[in-house]
Amino acid sequence: MNYLEFEKPLSEIEGKAEELRALARGNKEMDVEKEAAALDRKAEALLKDLYKDLTPWRKCQVARHPDRPHCKDYIEGLFTEYMPLAGDRNFADDHAIMGGLARFNDNPVVVIGQEKGHDTKTRIERNFGMARPEGYRKAIRLMDLAHRFRLPVVTLVDTPGAYPGKGAEERGQAEAIARATQKCLELGVPLVTVVIGEGGSGGAVALATANRIAMLEHSVYSVISPEGCASILWKDAEKMREAAEALRLTAQDLHKLGVIDRIIKEPLGGAQRGRRETVEAVGKAIEMMLKELVGRKPDWLIKDRRNKFLDMGSKGLAA
């Protein structure tokens, strides 16, 4: 288990309990279960206290936790007959975005998501979830297929933002993001999104201009990272806590503002402490969102999606 900075007291208690049990495994005559159980109760109480009222900055830390389920985990856990598509038919295949045809509850869908990777090798391969233009163009290809075959689209968002490198800019990063956002708005099929970790800037919006948007309880969704915001506004990245407060990037704030439609509860201690339960909860949320939309006419779906985003400026964010 990887512990976050604010979880250090918890790591000490759980570490002691594990040490006691390890000693008992090496010496059958030792009876440490009573002491270990007491430490377990203490750890659970502390965990509840730590997660009772997380600050926006702490939610950012939880959203970035390396042990949270990632896009690949959700696809493997919720979808069957997954057939990935590769490449943008123009430049290359971007591994930061994965997607393809699949079945969800036995019904055909198109699933698209950003994948960060779980270890050093896969994180480098996936570019830490930061897509290049070819990734967004691959997403457009998939959405075109969904539109042609009348398949609902499910997107899973988890990115710190689109890749800001020189090559990406030269190949039209801004244009690719804009085209992907435009494609979302034009789709005549149901489009639902779940923010499973970080939803960073236009790199997230390009996959999240949806009819229905859900966020995991401790995920975040913002125009910029707290560190980036602090660097621009205060010329000091260390002011990320103040920036996180000001950005109103938590699921709870965004639900109040009308930016998202649903909050998916996470297990105590975050998705990383209950990966299977989290995947199942996301599956139920996707099922409920699709039920609201499947069977609707294309014109209705397009109008619903457009009005959702147009209304943000007059009803939610402007309030």
Swiss-Prot record:
Biological source species: Cereibacter sphaeroides (strain ATCC 17025 / ATH 2.4.3)
Protein name per Swiss-Prot or TrEMBL: Acetyl-coenzyme A carboxylase carboxyl transferase subunit alpha
SUPFAM superfamilies in UniProt: ClpP/crotonase
Origin organism lineage: Bacteria, Pseudomonadati, Pseudomonadota, Alphaproteobacteria, Rhodobacterales
Top-level division of the source organism's lineage: Bacteria
Compartments where located: Cytoplasm
GO cellular component: acetyl-CoA carboxylase complex
Record note on quaternary structure: Acetyl-CoA carboxylase is a heterohexamer composed of biotin carboxyl carrier protein (AccB), biotin carboxylase (AccC) and two subunits each of ACCase subunit alpha (AccA) and ACCase subunit beta (AccD).
Enzyme class: transferase
Family: Belongs to the AccA family.
MF terms in GO: acetyl-CoA carboxylase activity; ATP binding; carboxyl- or carbamoyltransferase activity
The reaction(s) this protein catalyses: N(6)-carboxybiotinyl-L-lysyl-[protein] + acetyl-CoA = N(6)-biotinyl-L-lysyl-[protein] + malonyl-CoA
Annotated metabolic or biological route of this protein: Lipid metabolism; malonyl-CoA biosynthesis; malonyl-CoA from acetyl-CoA: step 1/1
Record-annotated CoA carboxyltransferase C-terminal domain positions: 38-292
